[in-house]
């Protein structure tokens, strides 16, 4: 009896009383996970895959399962129970649906045609807040792979043509029998293209593409935000051997603005005002994103941090007629470098001040006095 083989039930990760439906479900899940084509270059996956196949071939058959439950792996050694000769045939039918799941995508890619879609490209573009407000058309230059004109994208030297791969017959994939199961792999001779090039084009060295600088116009709509993505269909890399081109994706980032901070469609700015304007009230002008100006009126007694809303002076909303607002936050600036006369006037003002002129300060110091008074009276 073998001492190296793992229990078939453990291999399929099921209980010994598992029914046929549970066995099949477990088998499909593990086969998809460990299939060598999904784990290229990993020999352990191939070993694991073989173990899964062997376990399922035994446990799905009522007679073989009964023999295994009674005698273990010894039931199939030294010719026992047919010497395991029936595994190969059973494999093909058991795995037909698995292969459809694994290789269905390959069939849709145009197996045997050799055509491949070009890669998508990414281009990072920084724009100003004004650009996002108004919208613009920008010109960009990018290096991109285009179809080689010398060979029309075939990769073969002028006057010659690619030949159908003799290894796979143009299918792009080959099947290889390994014991009781068959693996389908990418053809090693043509790398899945279905064609081979004996005399490559000297301009593109057989790739069918060359790199060139391309100038493109990018339409940036009003209201774009940081991180907005713009897709230019068909402006990516050229496809291989007549395949369709990829797409170009423009990723926008907004440069920091000297005056405004953006929050969605709203704009925010901080404006310093004099102590006199804050105390007596008044008005001042602020710039707007459309390079205009607007007036902001402040009431008397305005404190630092107060915000004023200016409706409709924010950013346009992308693909909408809506427009955000602009918020102006005032910062009361304390005067510096006072003259002697100014100092005297402020000192006189301080003497004339009462609790009504500085309610927050009076309230704060009253709380401080109360706090220390309560500590002094504590036992």
Swiss-Prot record:
Needed cofactors: Zn(2+)
ZnF start-end (CR-type): 135-213
Keyword Signal attached: no
J domain ranges (all copies): 7-72
Main location: cytoplasm
GO biological process, one term: response to heat
Subcellular location: Cytoplasm
Molecular function via GO: ATP binding; heat shock protein binding; unfolded protein binding; zinc ion binding
Binding site for Zn(2+) 2: 165, 168, 187, 190
SS bond partners: none
A Pfam family this chain is assigned to: DnaJ_CXXCXGXG
Classification via PANTHER family: CHAPERONE PROTEIN DNAJ, DNAJ HOMOLOG 1, MITOCHONDRIAL-RELATED
UniProt family annotation: Belongs to the DnaJ family.
Purpose of the protein: Participates actively in the response to hyperosmotic and heat shock by preventing the aggregation of stress-denatured proteins and by disaggregating proteins, also in an autonomous, DnaK-independent fashion. Unfolded proteins bind initially to DnaJ; upon interaction with the DnaJ-bound protein, DnaK hydrolyzes its bound ATP, resulting in the formation of a stable complex. GrpE releases ADP from DnaK; ATP binding to DnaK triggers the release of the substrate protein, thus completing the reaction cycle.
Free-text note regarding domains: The J domain is necessary and sufficient to stimulate DnaK ATPase activity. Zinc center 1 plays an important role in the autonomous, DnaK-independent chaperone activity of DnaJ. Zinc center 2 is essential for interaction with DnaK and for DnaJ activity.
Protein name: Chaperone protein DnaJ
Gene name per UniProt: dnaJ
